[in-house]
């Protein structure tokens, strides 16, 4: 699986066991992701952070 880094022009290949891509937003500003990468389990959203997870190459 390949996931985009913070700047989507760059991406990385996920290590074994991390089979989801994610992007994280501040709830107050959903237009600009603050973090992207590989993850094993999609985190729950909080009052401050929103996570979007997916499982295809560079979907984040």
Swiss-Prot record:
A single BP term in Gene Ontology: killing of cells of another organism
Tissues where this protein is expressed: Expressed by the venom gland.
Keyword Secreted: yes
Disulfide bonding pattern of the chain: 3-21, 14-38, 42-53, 54-59
Domain of life: Eukaryota
Main localization category: secreted
Key words, A-Z: Cardiotoxin, Cytolysis, Disulfide bond, Membrane, Secreted, Target cell membrane, Target membrane, Toxin
Localization per record: Secreted; Target cell membrane
UniProt-listed InterPro entries: Cytotoxin_Cobra, Snake_3FTx, Snake_toxin-like_sf, Snake_toxin_con_site, Toxin_cobra-type
Subunit note: Monomer in solution; Homodimer and oligomer in the presence of negatively charged lipids forming a pore with a size ranging between 20 and 30 Angstroms.
Family note: Belongs to the three-finger toxin family. Short-chain subfamily. Type IA cytotoxin sub-subfamily.
Protein name: Cytotoxin 3
